Amino acid sequence: MSKARRGAGPLAVALAMTVTITANPAMAASAAEINRSVDAALASLHASVPETRQLANRAKAVLVFPNILKAGFLFGAQYGEGALRVRGKTAGYYNTAAASYGLQAGVQAFGYALFFMSDSARDYLSKSGGFELGTGPSIVVLDSGTAKAFTTTTTQDDIYAVFFDQKGLMAGLGLQGSKISRMEK
């Protein structure tokens, strides 16, 4: 069997996974399901990293993606749905999607929350209907150790991102290339 044929099988599987993850309407959750998932995710995040509660209280808005599925083998994709919370109330629904190519293999599920600390960052999200991470307002990724040393007087950036509930077999985690788009629910 030629090298081209041997490589075609995994490539076809990866392409099928990419299309399924990013384009499957059956994956779309209802507004009520998203709200329940966001409530549970925030409670879990605040319990595991208590400093995020203070960060959320100071934020102009918090965009929470409770469950993002990422899969890949050479080609990869990720998709998740979430809600924007302003003063504790849902102000809109968004999805996040990304595609990638490179040396990668595995499946991972995770969530993340974006804390919008300035009016301009929140307005950028709502006026643009979404944005591609890496363009627009600056984003600082906090891990649980950094968050513990964090105080409300040290928040000087537009957006802080905190990852949570990471499960799976994929190494590395990044926001580069992720596109966030507004959804109608």
Residue positions per predicted region:
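Bacterial N-terminal signal peptides
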Residues: 12-22
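Bacterial N-terminal signal peptides that target proteins for export
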Residues: 2-13
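Small-residue-enriched, tightly packed secondary-structure blocks
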Residues: 28-185
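Sec/Tat signal peptide C-region and signal peptidase I cleavage site
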Residues: 22-28
